[in-house]
């Protein structure tokens, strides 16, 4: 065998003969600047991407990727262009000022003279001004801001300018507006005799004849030293007038002293401040002669001379006789309603509706303070004799009341003794005719004509005059005259406003005992009105006439025959078909009591 060859030793030997293998290392050096003199610039390295241009800066993943190759080239081009800041081109220079000439300051004398002439010229208005007709003159004119006054207080001040006596409530706004516009001179003592009151559309125009709504103020107010002078409406400054009156008298109420409803009541009552009881009663009688003659849930009744004074506490924060006291705004409506019904008693030759059925309101006063000892004495004497169902009248100093001063109408039907059937018929025909007249004049509904709200008295008169929609008629009285009172629940349309009491706020009124005639009548009223008490539903008057017939049949004793009772029952049956008192007054039951037939 041949000699074996050691391959590994040969390999090692050959490597030793060839020498060491050269090592490859990276060498870093500065890049040579391109030759600026060269006109051609090689951009090939940009496209190849072997290196990143230093002018581009670090890679921006957010927006650099969206740039096109062309766009990148344009950026590179700008990097090697002369990027030195360029000088701004010189603008046109102003010519130098010639030597020896002085530049004058601007002269606006002509302009000043022009505007001075304009300012001195009074320019008459060529279009209506929103404030008042005047001239525009140089300078700023400041229109004084009038303080906020209630409508009623404003009109009270206007009436004070026109007349030194107090007038009626301005709730019926047209009354005072019409009066103030037409009067430029001082009126006589019969204040507001020229006022008129609108009536519902169905009433004829003649029914808006002149009426005296509210009497003049009492002697104390009339005697006040308030200057009266001729004055035109446009020259009245309400703010100055209020300040002047405030300085001459401490009797004028302010908004700080009373709430607005009390101020409205003062205006409606013709007062500048509340009275105390002695002041109010002294006008009608000696205070020592005051006697209590009756009471009700909401107040007390006292006799003062030939008048009856009904006192109703208002706006207190505690209950009286178990009931919440009435609010001033509720009494305000009753005050206006009372004055409105007074018009039906006025004997005017042009009156379209007239009747003496509603009690005459002689005066209404707003009082404040506790009961006077004289009144407490009268109250306790009544309590000892009759046993009062009301609370003892212990009231605080700031308690307010409305005192209605009414004509003495006699005794109520509950206590009055009817002698015979003719007197009973007279009662029914007077009540029916009275409701019919008020329906025609004011869409009136009493809504609470129970036997305590009808007063009867005897007199020597055989007949009473009535006018219904212009037709005159005389009613036989047989010596008995009735007066309807208490308009608390009543509804009336004054021509300016509908006054009513929302009975939905008194659900207990309709929860009286079953079988009781008065309670049943309330429930029948509710069914007729469907709880819409503002609406006109003359049928409610008929319901109370039916109630009166029931009272005569079941509660009152008088001389009568079975024939008379049959006539009353027949009348009740026919009344079930009537929708108003105007229809009922034409019933055959009343035909022989009307000297002139109403049709």
Swiss-Prot record:
The family database entries (Pfam families) matched by this protein are listed as: Haspin_kinase
Keyword ATP-binding annotated: yes
The molecular function terms of the Gene Ontology recorded here are: ATP binding; histone H3T11 kinase activity; histone H3T3 kinase activity; protein serine kinase activity
The keyword Cell cycle belongs to this UniProt entry's keyword annotation: yes
Which residues are named in the active-site annotation? 448
Positions of the Protein kinase domain: 287-599
Induction remarks: Expression peaks at mitosis.
Q: What is its EC number?
A: 2.7.11.1
- Which tissues carry this protein? Expressed in meristems and primordia of root tips, lateral roots, shoot apex, leaves and flowers.
Please tell me which top-level EC class this enzyme sits in: transferase
* Disruption of the gene: reported phenotype: Embryonic lethality when homozygous.
Q: Which InterPro entries match?
A: GSG2_C, Kinase-like_dom_sf, Prot_kinase_dom
Q: Which key words tag this protein in UniProt?
A: ATP-binding, Cell cycle, Chromosome, Cytoplasm, Cytoskeleton, Kinase, Nucleotide-binding, Nucleus, Serine/threonine-protein kinase, Transferase
Provide one Gene Ontology biological process annotation: mitotic cell cycle
Q: Where does ATP bind?
A: 293-301, 310, 407-412, 448-453, 486-488
- Protein location: Cytoplasm; Cytoplasm, Perinuclear region; Nucleus; Chromosome
Q: Which reaction does it catalyse?
A: L-seryl-[protein] + ATP = O-phospho-L-seryl-[protein] + ADP + H(+); L-threonyl-[protein] + ATP = O-phospho-L-threonyl-[protein] + ADP + H(+)
Provide a GO CC annotation, any one.
cytoskeleton
**Record-stated family:** Belongs to the protein kinase superfamily. Ser/Thr protein kinase family. Haspin subfamily.
Task: Outline what the protein does.
Answer: Threonine-protein kinase that phosphorylates histone H3 in vitro at 'Thr-3' (H3T3ph) and 'Thr-11' (H3T11ph), but not at 'Ser-10' (H3S10ph) or 'Ser-28' (H3S28ph). Plays a role in mitotic cell division during plant growth. Threonine-protein kinase that phosphorylates histone H3 in vitro at 'Thr-3' (H3T3ph), but not at 'Thr-11' (H3T11ph), 'Ser-10' (H3S10ph) or 'Ser-28' (H3S28ph). Involved in histone H3 phosphorylation in mitotic cells. Contributes to organ and plant development, as well as embryonic patterning.
Note, other: Over-expression of an inactive kinase mutant decreases the size of the root meristem and delays root growth.
Protein name from the UniProt record: Serine/threonine-protein kinase haspin homolog
Origin organism is Arabidopsis thaliana
Primary gene name: HASPIN
